[in-house]
Each structure stands twice: as structure tokens, then as C-alpha cells.
């Protein structure tokens, strides 16, 4: 039966070709219907003419394919009861076409089969849409009962075959012309059938044609999508019947391609220009080897329909979704929503909607023409796709879509060949970004010229997705500063966006580019549109960096950046692995290393040390060799670089030369050597110091190790990660380091460069500034890894902590140096730390939410200064601290000066440095250095805030000081580490410029003193700002305020242990004095809640140390003065990151939840001022220390705050204001109070809206995000600040 029918079909198709081309549709229609009436149809008996064969088939298809047939038939919303089945036309719905080798074909279904039952439901009289829905509902399983009608061939059949076949279905029946009602069409069809039957001479092909005419061709939306199995176009001759009827090939995945004859004949019949369906189908999927021309011919019904007069929009609706395409079809229409594929070809698996080109073959495969005609045009021009054939852009777009899409399939979008071949085009395309409507695949369109068929997916109006080239991929994207390591912090746009980029970039790439030279163009070339975007971002970063550099803060803190920026050398010291050695880049680094990093033997303990020491000597070589014996353990890792044998920085074990860490070290060493030569001393050692700070990508850290392993050549490996990995691998080395860490002070320099949120610039500062710096770098390296690797980190942290306790013992001031270390990592919970500090992107993060002080967590690695303070710090005998203090006391100020050789190698010197930092104010010459520090610190803060060099996310600046963490440990407050949400931690102690370090250490000392006092104090004491301790210089006080912001690491718990503070008498005395003072202050605070904090700033209590202020202060020497939050002797829980920023402070308010932390958050202080529960977490030391009598500090804070980029947590930290609202419960506030409160938060810009909306204190607690947005607080940072402040208020 099949054979005769096929023959008939073939003959009829041939005949059609001969006969019908000259006929118009109307002529054919007239012929078809002129002789017959419905009555005649009904009366006519074709039983003799037709052989009826019924069969039931079960179709099982895959999700990504269709059933392989195109259903066609009368369209009606309800069953057409008037329809009387006849042998010749037993049902309304029939198979217009069946894909060869498709599911239906294999089940025995053939073109012309009438569908009588679907899933055991009778559909003889059911309309097309309902049947299609039934089929769809069946899912991948379909049971069909079909009737195959075969005409008996009479002797005269042969002759009849040559007779003109009945006209193709009337235009009325044409899907495109849906003008006629179903009934009228049915009638006509019936007439046709009747006539056919009457004259048995009508061939089977004629009957089939009539059937087709009878049935309104309707695309089987879902069924088609179900994807009739796509198959190569059948020769026109093969499908005469199909040719007669407009074939609705399923556009769905399988995309049956209507036989060319079918489509052509169908189009001819319809009088529709044949537009190749945009999505020819093939079982194999979108990749059809079919030439474009073929595809065009195969255009889906929808394409044809539009020609008929249906709009492309309509066609889209008409066309079944392209879901079935193997590539994008799997994605439902969502593909339309999917952004266009990147300019670069996407990976071979085409994205669901790689581009408009991928627009589903929907009725009108919407090319760009449909959605983006402009784009389509561009595409059309770019790719001489047959689209030209389509007159309208939509058609062209569709054609292009086919090609592009197919190309995308054929050539993986990622395929380099395609991309390269089209690079210029894409480049042009990118250059024409204004035209971005163009599909990035327009290039693909050219590929399309290759004849690849790409099913058109629905075009997405949204901008095309451009494949984001890896930041690492484009050197230009990479910070001009070569940062072999991928240190890209989330806010890669951090103050030194470049650095963040550079960090991600390979060092070599960076070498070619200077800091300021991000080459967006190149990246564009590489990535296309995305590259362009990145380039723009890079440019912005560059601008930012320039501004930062120009700003005073940059001069003080960003010198390194400047140096780096100018240096064309690929190395970006900041971005280099934490290892200073990574910076071994330049003499600058060497100078830095010498002065700022201690070449302490600790090198072994820290990768940094190794690198640093080598830096000092021969940045690369010396680094490897210089590390002294114990340090050589780490140094071997680095210095061994030359020999190929590396010591694990943490464990001190020899690394397998092939291990990722060893490779990374080797690469770093090589880079260092290279860098050393090119940039021996690009600028002052100070600048080198700035460069020296390592950008630690805490976020990337975990991956960095792998990356480093993968990229042995990347100097840019994050040392921090390396150290982290080192720490993780070997605890033994960690132990060594721990011992060393004790001596080591890690300063995190403010580097405006480190604007990138993710980057932390870690300067390790030993007791001796210069050496300290080196050691600190090492430790920084050590510590950061511990943060990264919890277990290894703990050990280093313990070590660090041990050192910290020593410092604490030496004197509270000693803590300042250490503070950075402590602040960065909590000794006990390295893991937590990484998440403590809000990622840079979230400048305003609620500390309360993030920090539950019940269990202080270390700041997130991003924000951690990669300082691990060993929990053991608390274990350090107070005597040692006292000794350190004494030593420091004796030479308290040498540390400020950077003497590369100053006992930097000796742990003792480090201790001394720490001690001097920690020394009580009485012990230190804090005033002198303090002044310097304050100036430089403030300057840094200001410039930083103003230019936001470091802190694009400056708002999230938090002063993280180990001081707070170690507060109870003996006031061994590490220098305050200002950690920015950016993830940048800046230690005031070690300013990029030596003067700052001097000043900062002093500040630290002063702070340490206060911190110690705070340590002694209980939370209640902290709640109240201490009366300004006379010893603290005003500038120091601000630093303390910042300290308040510092987030306390778990060290706080240790501090608790230390709290007993078996400190040398000086420290003990100081602590006792401070405790008494704090107690008094607490009482005073209770009495005058707003006084202490308010007076300094008038904005926020110093204790609040608004983030901006604190951050600034932190950046400035004040950072060093990070307030140490004392943990009540009973409180083991370290306060985590209280110094963070106002944000952190706010969190501290949240911290209050965990009373254990002694530190009172600024908000808490406010509360205290308003006699609030002292049990609330103590305000940051800065709060306590900032005395009402310290207006200067307040000024500093005010300046800092003003400079802070945006209302930062510091702002949020509710400065205790003299305004009435500060004394009233929030629910008692009036509109004016709310407005004043907003002003105090530096959010006065929203004052009017709040006033206009009559927002009073009763409304504030209930304000939701949507409410704030309605009130005009559209900036996330502002909302967060408000929410934070509200939390503080509510917690008071």
C-alpha cells in the first residue's frame, strides 16, 4: 500500500510542478470546489475507491525530539459534529508529513494517515488544536490510531494521474489565510472529496491533496515541538502529497524538514513565497548539513505564514516553540529570554538561545527581523545568509538565525576557528557595539555562509550575552599591574580595579601592560562585547586608580600602586601572591621588603618571609636565599625556586617540584627575578612597600592554589593561597610560623590600588618596621592561608596569637601591630573568617546579621588580611608580652622607621615592634609617631575615602584589629587592620610610607593601651566610651575608634584567656587604669549617652567609628589604633570583626546579641549613652576610646566619614548625636527626629522624602526594602546603612 501511495505522491508532485505553477491559488480553488457540494460529498461512496487500513501505533519519543510527523487538519475549538467521516476522509486530522526515520515513521505512520484516536480518545471530529493539545499532554508517549486510506488504482488511474491534480487547498484553508471558518473550509473540503470520489479517476494523490485541503493546515505546536524527527529534506518528487498541502513541519527539535517538494508545492499552492523555514529539522539536531538554500525552502509554516500576511509577531506565536532543538530546543521558549550568545562563539552546545539567531523556529523563526529588525539587518549584512531571499528583515533574520544557530551548533560558539575567522568581524561588531542589537552571532551568520543551518531561536530583545572572556584571558583586562595570581575580588572594580583585574591576569600579560594601561580593546578583541564591557570597567578602574593615586591617600597608601601602575612589568605586586617575594618584583619591593617586611627567619614560617627576604636581597634570588635558616624552610619553597625544591611555607616540608605550590613558587620566583630586574626600585621603598602589600584574593584563595599549581608561571599566584595550601599541607611549618608569627606583625597597607573588594593588601610588619614588614608579609601569607585553610590556618593563627599575646603582654599598645593579624583571622575559626567580612561588593553589610558574637568568626578571607593569629597567642605567657613590651618600650620607635635589617629577621625584633605597637602609651613615644601616623593615617584615610582608591568599597571598610581580638590577650592589639568590604585590609601600623608606620605603631600603642583597658573592662565598660585617656593623642583616639570598627577575630576568645592579662606591670597597670577609666566612661556613658562619641565627630560617636571614619582612620595611622575590644575575662568568644566599619559596628550592635564580646559596637555605645544594656556587645574600643573630649578625633572621623565614598557602616554606626532623637526611643521619634537621624547617617539626601512621607519613629522599624525604595533610597548601600542603623537603634 505504501508503495502505490508513494508513487502516487511522487507522480502527483511531479504533476503539480507541471500543472500548477501557472495557476493562481484562486484558480485552483475554483477548480477544486466548482463541481461539488457537501451533499454530493456525503452521498458519494468511495468504498470501492479506497482501501482503508486501520492501525494503532505507540510512539515513544525522547524529550529532545518530536514524534516525527506534522499533523494537519480542520481547526475548530470544539468537535465538528457536522463532519461525517467517509472512507476517503475518515477523520479531520491527518498526517501532513512524516519524517523519514522519525519516531512516527518507524512506527509505520505515513503521510496522509488520518488520525482517529489519540491516546485512546476519538478525535475523528476534533479540531486541530485540541488534538495537538491531546498529543502534547501525552508527553513523550503517544498512542495513535490511524486510518490509512489507499485508493484502489483503476486502469485509468495512470491516465488520471497525469490529469491535473485537484487544486491545492484553497487559500481559505491555507493556514496563513485563516479567513474562512472551519465549517466553510470543511464544506469545501467535503466538496472536494465528494468530487474526488465521484470521479474515481481522481488519484490517491488527489484524494490526499483534497484531504490536505480539507484540513486546515495548523502547525502542531507542541507536537511539532515534540519534534517530529528532523530528516533531510525529501526530494520534491518523494512527497507529492505533501507538496500539495502546506506542510507544517515540526519546527521542534527534530524539525522535520518538509520535503522540499512539500514546502515548495505547498508554498506554491498557497501562493506564498517560499521562505525557507529558519529551522530545518534533522533528527540529528540543529546541525543539518543542509545548504542554506535548502533550509530556506524548508522554512517552517510560520515563515510561510508571515508571507501570507501574518505578522512576524503572530508567526512567532504560531510557530511551535523551538524547544525541541537538540541545542536550544531543550530550553523552552525561555530561549527567547536568554541573552544572545557572546560575540565569541559559545561552546559547541549552543546556549538555549545563543542569540536572536537562535530564535526558535517559531512560526516566524523570529530573526532579529522579528524582534530586532535592526539587528537582523546587521546580521543579514554580516552574514550573506540566504535571508536575503526573505524580503523582510524578519525573514532575513530568520534565515540568519538558521545559519547562525546552525553554525553555533556546528561550530561551537567557543570554536576558535569560527571565532578567529570572524574575529575581525566580531571586532567590528564589537566596535559597533552601539549596534549591539546585532546578534553577536552575526559573525556566526558569516559562518552561516558555510551553509550551516542554525535553527532560528526566538530573538531576544535583551542585549546579547557576550561570552565573558576570562579576566585572566585578557592582559589588558588584567590590572595593568601584573598579578600573576588571580586575585580578582568580587568587586574587581575595587579601588585598584586594575589590581583586581591584574590579579586575575597572568603576570606576563600584565607585563606588557602598565598599571594604567588596561586595554579594553584587546580584551574586546578577545571577548567581544563582553570584552568591551570589561574594557569599560577597566577604564573606569584606571580612572579610579588615577584619581586614587592623585589623591593624598594614594600617595600615602597607594604609592605601591603608583609604582606598580607606572611599571610596565607584568608583575602587580599588590596582586602578587601575598608573598612579598611575589612582589619580589622590584627593588621597590625589595625596599619595601627590607623596610616593611622583616627578613626574619620567620621566612620559613611564611612564604612571604621567604619571598620578602629574597626581595630584600635579590628580590627573586635573595628572596630564596636570604631567608634565614628557619625561614629558609619557607624560603626554600621560594628560594628553592631556583633549585626547584621548595619548602612548604606553612609546614616547612619540601614540596614536590611538581606540586602546584612548588610550581607556583617557582613561577613566582621566576617572576620575581624578572620583576626585580625591570623594577628594582620603581619608587621609594615606601612605594615598594605599597606594592609589597599582597593582594590576597580571599575568595579565590581556595581556587588559587589550584590555579597556582596550574600556572606555575604565574607569579601572580596568591601567596596567600600558596601559604594557605602550605598551611593546609603541613602543620609543622605552620608551627614554626606560629612561633614566628608571634613576633610578626602583619600590617595590611591601605592601598588605594586595593580598591578591588576582593583584594587584601597584606603588609607584614615585624616588630622592627622594616624587618617587620617582611615578616608580616610572610605572616600575612601564612595567616591568609590559614584563613583559607581552616586547619592549617588555625595553627598559624595560634602562632600568631601566641605572638599577639606576647605583644599584649608587652603592652596593650603592642597589640596594634599584631592587631592586623588578629583582626584578619580568628585563631580558632579560620573558616568563619572568610565570611565574616561582607564581600567587597556589599559595602554595607549588616554586621549584626553577619556576626553573631556568640561565636566570633574570622572575617572572610577576602577581607581578612590573611593574618592568622594563632589561638596560641593567648597561650603566650604574659611575661613574654611584658618582655616584648619592655623591649618595645626601650626601642618603641625603631619599628616605625623601616630598617630592612633591623632585627627584622629576629623574632625578638618583631616582638619588639609588636610590643612598641602594643606598648602602653606611657611606654611609647606615641605622641610623636602618633602625630605622624595620624597625619599620614588620616591622609590615607582621607585620600582613600575621597578617592576611594582602595575602597571603591570603602564604605565597607572595617578596621579589623587583632587588638580587639587579642584585647584580653594582653592588649596585644595587632595593628588595626582596616578591612574593607572590598576585602582589603589596611593596617595603619604599616603605612605604605615609613612615616606612617612610625606614627601608626605609636597609634597602635596608644590604642593598645586603651584596648588593654578595654580588655580589663567588661562589656558594660565598653558600652560607655572611656573618658578620653590623656595618654591617647586625639589622632590616636580616632584610630581607636577605628579599632572599634575592627572586626574581632576569634582571637577574642583567646583574648578572654589573656584577659587575665598576666601582663608586665606596665601593661597591667595600664590595663587596670584603662579598665577603671572604661568603667568610669561606661558610667559616664550611661549618664551622657551621646556625649563621648558625639563630641569627636558630632556625627557618630567615635566609638561608633563610622565605617567611613573608621575606615579612613583605619587607613590612616588611626587604623593602627584600631580599638582593641576587650573580651570580658569570662567571655571566650572572640568578637569577630567589630572593627569592620560602621557596617561592622552596626554588626557589632548585632554583636551585642552575643554579650560575650566585650567590645561594644558603636550602636551599642549609643545605647550605652542612652543608658542601654551594657550587656550588649561592647562598643568597639574606638567607641570607648573616643572620648567626648576628643573633638580632634571626631574631626578626623568626620573627615574620614566625609571622605568615605558612601554612607558606610561607619555612617550607619549611629553616631551618638546631640540631637534629640539620640535620647529618645526610636518609637518616640518624630519626623524631624527621623530626618535628623538620616542626617547623622549621612543620608540626608533622603531626608526630604522621609519627611514628605511623614516617616516617624513608629514607621522606621517596619520599613522594608520596598518601602525604602519607594522613599527614594534606591542605593543598596544606603538601604543597608539605614537597616543597619535601625538594627542598632532597635538593639539599644
UniProtKB/Swiss-Prot annotation:
Coiled coil: none
PDZ domain sequence ranges: 56-150
Pro residues bias locations: 338-354
Residue ranges occupied by any SAM domain in the UniProt entry: 1229-1292
Position of sequence motif SH3-binding: 991-997
Disordered, as annotated region: 155-176, 331-393, 488-508, 604-656, 671-743, 774-811, 938-968, 1087-1115
Principal subcellular localisation of the protein: cytoplasm
Gene Ontology CC: one annotated term: dendritic spine
Domain of life: Eukaryota
Compartment(s) where it occurs, according to its Swiss-Prot or TrEMBL record: Cytoplasm; Synapse; Postsynaptic density
Pfam families on file: PDZ_6 (PF17820), SAM_1 (PF00536)
Entry keywords, A to Z: Cytoplasm, SH3-binding, Synapse
Record-level Gene Ontology MF annotations: ionotropic glutamate receptor binding; SH3 domain binding; synaptic receptor adaptor activity
Stretches with biased composition (Low complexity): 355-365, 492-504, 953-968
Biased segments, Polar residues type: 375-384, 604-623, 1098-1115
Composition-biased stretches (Basic and acidic residues): 719-743, 941-952
Task performed by this protein: Seems to be an adapter protein in the postsynaptic density (PSD) of excitatory synapses that interconnects receptors of the postsynaptic membrane including NMDA-type and metabotropic glutamate receptors, and the actin-based cytoskeleton. May play a role in the structural and functional organization of the dendritic spine and synaptic junction.
Family in the record: Belongs to the SHANK family.
The protein's name: SH3 and multiple ankyrin repeat domains protein 2
Native source organism of the sequence: Xenopus laevis
Amino acid at each position: 500500500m505504501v508503495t502505490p501511495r508513494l508513487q502516487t505522491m511522487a507522480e502527483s508532485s511531479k504533476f503539480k510542478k507541471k500543472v500548477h505553477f501557472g495557476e493562481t491559488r484562486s484558480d485552483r480553488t475554483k477548480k477544486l470546489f466548482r463541481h461539488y457540494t457537501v451533499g454530493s460529498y456525503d452521498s458519494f461512496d468511495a468504498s470501492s475507491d479506497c482501501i482503508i487500513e486501520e492501525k494503532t501505533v505507540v510512539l515513544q519519543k525522547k524529550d529532545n525530539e518530536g514524534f516525527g510527523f506534522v499533523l494537519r487538519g480542520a481547526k475548530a475549538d470544539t468537535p465538528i459534529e457536522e463532519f461525517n467521516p467517509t472512507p476517503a476522509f475518515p477523520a479531520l486530522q491527518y498526517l501532513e508529513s512524516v519524517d523519514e526515520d522519525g519516531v512516527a515513521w518507524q512506527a509505520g505512520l505515513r503521510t496522509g494517515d488520518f488520525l482517529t484516536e489519540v491516546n485512546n480518545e476519538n478525535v475523528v471530529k476534533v479540531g486541530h488544536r485540541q488534538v495537538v493539545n491531546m498529543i502534547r499532554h501525552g508527553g513523550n508517549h503517544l498512542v495513535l490510531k490511524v486510518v490509512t486510506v489507499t485508493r484502489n488504482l483503476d486502469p485509468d488511474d495512470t491516465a488520471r494521474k497525469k490529469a491535473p491534480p485537484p487544486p491545492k487547498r484553497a487559500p481559505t484553508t491555507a493556514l496563513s489565510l485563516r479567513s474562512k471558518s472551519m465549517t466553510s473550509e470543511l464544506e469545501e473540503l467535503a466538496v472536494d472529496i465528494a468530487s474526488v470520489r465521484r470521479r474515481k479517476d481522481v488519484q490517491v494523490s488527489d484524494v490526499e491533496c483534497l484531504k490536505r485541503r480539507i484540513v486546515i493546515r495548523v502547525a502542531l505546536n507542541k507536537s511539532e515541538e515534540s519534534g517530529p524527527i528532523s530528516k533531510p529534506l525529501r526530494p520534491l518528487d518523494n512527497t507529492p502529497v505533501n507538496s500539495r498541502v502546506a506542510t507544517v513541519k515540526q519546527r521542534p527539535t527534530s524539525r522535520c524538514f518538509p520535503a522540499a517538494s512539500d514546502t515548495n508545492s505547498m508554498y506554491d499552492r498557497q501562493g506564498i513565497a517560499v521562505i525557507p523555514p529558519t529551522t530545518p529539522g534533522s533528527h540529528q539536531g540543529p546541525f543539518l548539513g543542509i545548504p542554506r538554500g535548502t533550509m530556506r525552502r524548508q522554512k517552517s509554516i510560520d515563515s510561510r505564514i508571515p508571507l501570507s500576511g501574518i505578522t512576524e509577531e503572530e508567526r512567532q506565536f504560531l510557530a511551535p516553540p523551538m524547544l525541541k532543538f537538540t541545542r536550544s530546543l531543550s530550553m523552552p521558549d525561555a530561549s527567547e529570554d536568554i541573552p544572545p550568545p557572546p560575540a565569541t562563539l559559545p561552546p559547541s552546545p549552543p546556549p538555549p538561545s545563543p542569540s536572536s539567531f537562535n530564535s526558535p523556529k517559531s512560526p516566524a523563526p523570529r530573526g532579529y527581523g522579528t524582534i530586532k529588525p535592526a539587528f537582523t539587518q546587521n546580521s543579514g549584512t554580516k552574514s550573506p545568509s540566504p535571508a536575503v531571499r526573505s524580503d523582510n528583515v524578519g525573514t532575513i533574520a530568520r534565515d540568519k538565525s538558521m545559519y547562525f544557530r546552525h553554525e553555533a551548533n556546528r561550530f561551537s560558539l567557543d570554536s576558535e576557528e569560527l571565532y578567529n575567522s570572524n574575529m575581525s568581524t566580531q571586532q567590528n561588531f564589537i566596535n559597533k557595539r552601539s549596534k549591539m542589537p546585532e546578534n553577536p552571532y552575526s559573525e556566526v551568520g558569516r559562518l552561516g555562509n558555510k551553509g550551516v543551518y542554525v535553527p532560528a531561536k526566538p530573538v531576544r530583545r535583551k542585549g546579547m550575552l557576550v561570552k565573558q572572556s576570562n579576566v585572566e584571558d585578557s592582559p589588558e583586562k588584567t590590572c595593568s599591574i601584573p598579578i600573576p595570581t588571580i586575585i580578582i575580588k568580587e568587586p574587581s572594580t575595587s579601588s585598584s580595579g586594575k589590581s583586581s583585574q591584574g590579579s586575575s591576569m597572568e603576570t606576563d600579560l600584565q607585563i606588557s601592560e602598565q598599571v594604567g594601561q588596561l586595554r579594553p580593546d584587546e580584551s574586546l578583541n578577545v571577548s567581544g562585547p563582553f570584552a568591551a564591557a570589561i574594557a569599560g570597567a577597566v577604564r573606569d578602574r584606571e580612572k579610579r586608580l588615577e584619581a586614587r593615586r592623585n589623591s593624598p591617600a594614594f600617595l600615602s597608601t597607594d604609592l605601591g600602586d603608583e609604582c606598580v601602575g607606572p611599571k610596565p612589568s607584568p608583575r602587580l605586586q599588590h596582586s602578587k601572591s601575598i608573598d612579598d617575594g611575589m612582589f619580589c618584583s622590584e627593588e621597590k619591593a625589595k625596599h619595601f621588603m627590607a623596610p616593611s617586611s622583616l627578613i626574619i627567619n620567620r621566612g620559613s614560617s611564611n612564604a612571604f618571609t621567604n619571598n620578602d627576604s629574597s626581595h630584600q636581597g635579590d628580590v627573586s634570588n635573595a628572596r630564596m636565599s636570604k631567608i634565614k635558616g628557619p625561614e629558609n624552610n619557607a624560603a626554600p619553597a621560594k628560594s628553592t625556586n631556583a633549585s626547584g625544591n621548595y619548602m612548604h611555607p606553612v609546614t616547612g616540608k619540601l614540596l614536590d617540584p611538581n606540586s602546584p605550590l612548588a610550581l607556583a613558587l617557582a613561577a613566582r620566583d621566576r617572576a620575581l627575578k624578572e620583576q626585580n630586574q625591570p623594577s628594582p626600585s620603581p619608587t621609594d621603598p615606601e612605594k615598594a612597600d605599597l606594592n609589597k602589600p599582597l593582594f590576597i584574593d580571599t575568595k579565590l584563595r581556595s581556587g588559587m592554589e589550584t590555579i597556582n599549581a596550574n600556572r606555575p608561571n604565574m607569579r601572580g599566584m596568591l601567596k596567600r593561597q600558596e601559604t594557605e595550601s602550605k598551611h593546609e599541607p603541613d602543620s609543622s611549618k605552620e608551627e614554626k610560623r606560629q612561633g614566628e608569627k608571634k613576633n610578626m606583625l602583619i600590617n595590611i597597607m591601605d592601598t588605594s590600588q586595593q580598591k578591588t573588594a576582593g583584594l587584601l593588601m597584606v603588609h607584614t610588619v615585624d616588630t622592627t618596621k622594616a624587618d617587620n614588614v617582611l615578616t608580616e608579609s610572610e605572616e600575612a601569607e601564612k595567616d591568609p592561608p590559614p584563613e583559607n585553610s581552616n586547619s592549617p590556618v588555625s595553627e598559624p593563627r595560634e602562632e600568631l596569637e601566641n605572638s599577639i599575646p606576647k605583644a599584649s603582654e608587652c603592652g596593650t599598645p603592642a597589640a596594634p601591630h599584631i592587631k592586623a593579624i588578629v583582626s584578619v583571622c580568628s585563631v580558632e575559626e579560620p573558616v568563619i573568617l572568610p565570611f565574616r567580612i561582607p564581600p567587597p561588593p556589599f559595602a554595607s553589610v549588616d554586621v549584626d546579621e553577619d556576626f553573631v558574637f556568640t561565636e566570633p568568626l574570622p572575617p572572610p578571607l577576602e577581607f581578612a588580611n590573611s593574618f592568622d593569629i594563632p589561638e596560641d597567642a593567648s597561650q603566650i605567657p604574659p611575661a613574654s608580652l611584658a618582655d616584648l613590651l619592655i623591649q618595645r618600650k626601650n626601642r618603641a620607635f625603631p619599628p616605625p622607621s623601616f630598617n630592612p635589617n633591623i632585627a627584622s629577621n629576629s623574632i625578638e625584633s618583631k616582638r619588639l615592634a609588636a610590643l612598641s605597637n602594643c606598648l602602653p602609651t606611657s611606654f611609647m613615644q606615641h605622641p610623636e609617631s602618633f602625630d605622624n601616623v595620624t597625619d599620614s593615617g588620616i591622609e590615607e584615610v582621607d585620600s582613600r575615602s575621597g578617592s576611594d582608591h582602595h575602597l571603591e568599597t570603602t564604605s565597607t571598610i572595617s578596621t579589623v584589629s587583632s587588638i580587639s581580638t587579642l584585647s584580653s590577650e594582653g592588649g596585644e592589639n595587632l595593628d588595626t587592620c582596616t578591612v574593607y568590604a572590598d576585602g582589603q585590609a589596611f593596617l595603619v601600623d604599616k603605612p605604605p610610607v615609613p612615616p606612617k608606620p612610625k606614627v601608626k605603631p605609636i597609634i597602635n600603642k596608644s590604642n593598645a593601651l586603651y584596648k588593654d583597658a578595654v580588655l580589663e573592662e567588661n562589656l558594660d565598660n565598653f558600652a560607655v566610651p572611656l573618658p578620653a585617656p590623656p595618654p591617647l593623642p586625639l589622632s590616636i583616639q580616632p584610630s581607636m575608634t577605628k579599632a572599634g570598627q575592627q572586626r574581632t577575630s576569634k582571637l577574642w576568645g583567646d583574648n578572654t584567656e589573656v584577659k587575665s592579662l598576666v601582663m608586665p606591670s606596665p601593661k597591667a597597670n595600664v590595663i587596670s587604669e584603662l579598665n577603671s577609666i572604661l568603667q568610669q566612661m561606661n558610667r559616664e556613658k550611661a549618664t551622657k549617652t551621646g556625649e563621648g562619641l558625639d563630641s569627636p565627630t558630632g556625627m557618630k560617636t567615635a566609638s561608633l567609628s563610622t565605617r567611613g571614619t573608621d575606615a579612613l582612620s583605619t587607613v590612616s595611622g588611626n587604623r593602627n589604633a584600631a580599638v582593641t575590644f576587650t573580651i570580658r575575662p569570662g567571655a571566650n568568644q572572640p568578637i569577630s570583626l567589630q572593627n569592620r566599619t560602621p557596617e561592622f559596628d552596626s554588626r557589632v550592635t548585632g554583636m551585642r546579641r552575643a554579650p560575650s564580646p566585650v567590645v561594644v559596637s558603636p550602636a551599642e555605645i549609643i545605647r550605652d549613652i542612652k543608658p542601654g544594656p551594657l550587656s550588649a556587645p561592647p562598643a568597639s574600643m574606638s567607641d570607648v576610646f573616643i572620648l567626648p573630649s576628643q573633638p580632634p578625633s571626631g574631626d578626623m572621623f568626620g573627615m574620614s566619614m566625609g571622605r568615605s565614598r558612601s554612607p558606610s557602616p561607619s555612617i550607619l554606626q549611629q553616631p551618638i548625636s546631640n540631637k534629640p532623637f539620640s535620647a529618645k526611643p526610636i518609637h518616640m521619634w518624630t519626623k524631624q527626629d527621623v530626618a535628623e537621624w538620616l542626617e547623622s547617617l549621612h543620608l540626608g539626601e533622603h531626608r526630604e522624602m522621609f519627611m514628605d512621607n511623614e516617616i516617624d519613629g513608629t514607621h522606621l522599624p517596619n520599613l522594608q526594602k520596598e518601602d525604602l525604595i519607594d522613599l527614594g533610597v534606591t542605593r543598596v548601600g544606603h538601604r543597608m546603612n539605614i537597616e543597619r542603623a535601625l538594627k542598632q537603634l532597635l538593639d539599644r
